[in-house]
Amino acid sequence: DEHRKKKLLKNYHPGKLPTDLSRPYFELSKGQDAVTQMETCDLNLWMVGDILLKADKMSMANSLELRVPFLDRKVFELASHIPTKCKVNATQTKIAMRGAAEKTIPAKTADKKKLGFPVPVRAWLRDEQYAGVVRKAFNTPAAEQFFRTKELNAMLDQHISGKRDNWRQIWCIFMFLVWYDEYFVKR
């Protein structure tokens, strides 16, 4: 949130907000239900510019041909006409797909929670071996240039102790500092 950004960043000046980037896609699906609006936004921002791009790069880097069966044009067109109530409700996601899957695979598999490709960053950042590397980066001149390092270290301490689950913020800042070091400090 804005308060947290002001607390962590030196010289923080709000520019474009994430809502500025997503607004055109919500406008595109104006009048649709909230789920359809989020799907439109995901299709145009997250899938194309993020997840599919990463999957493509990772598979090509390893000489693999990747297929995304649910993005087959016919499957996608069919799925886009499924009513929202058959997609999600307050307690379940992928309702139609799970129902179809239960006809051919065990229910416990069809009803399994989506896992994706989890990386245990949350746990790594509670392990002093890895947290120490992050802490070192949080106390560099580069970190000092952009961030209030006292706040960064407090955020890391809260995460390690289990008081707050800050892994996403810590990881994003750490990745920024690694990138900055690689492309601006070392060059």
Residue ranges, per PLM feature:
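Adenosyl-5′-phosphate
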Residues: 1-187
